[in-house]
Regions:
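N-terminal helical hairpins
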Residues: 1-9, 25-26, 41-123
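Hydrophobic alpha-helical membrane-insertion signals
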Residues: 28-30
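Short strand-coil-strand connectors
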Residues: 36-38
Length: 123
């Protein structure tokens, strides 16, 4: 097997969870989650919006300031999404095949909302 093919196989099997702004050119943007698994990428909004100038692109978190104290709450929510995504990845690693987008987000939502009283209302 040549180097490029071997490298591609290794990269394909790397899992990653990160966050990004859907509209970084605007003044306020929605935050989205991006999860990659077995070469497939899953992305969608997490229904949180922030002023773009408060986004720390290196840390993938909101800058907390005296003027924007709700940044702590949003960062806690991002951490909760990240943990749910890692649990979801663990669930699908048993099967070795990347799930469909709908299957992936069904399990992710179940992991994220499992401590909530009600079920999620949006997909």
């Amino acid at each position: 097997m040549d180097y490029n093919r071997a490298r591609a196989n290794v990269l394909k099997n790397v899992s990653m969870v990160t966050f990004f702004l859907l509209n970084p050119e605007r003044e306020v943007s929605t935050i989205a989650i991006l999860v990659s698994f077995n070469g497939k990428k899953y992305r969608r909004s997490i229904h949180e919006s922030i002023p773009v100038n408060l986004w720390n692109n290196d840390k993938k978190r909101v800058r907390v300031s005296a003027k924007y104290q709700q940044g702590n709450i949003i960062n806690d929510t991002l951490s909760k999404w990240e943990v749910a995504a890692l649990r979801t990845l663990s669930h699908f690693k048993e099967y070795y095949n990347a799930p469909s987008k709908d299957e992936f987000f069904e399990v992710l939502d179940r992991e994220f909302y499992k401590d909530e009283v009600g079920e999620p209302t949006q997909k």
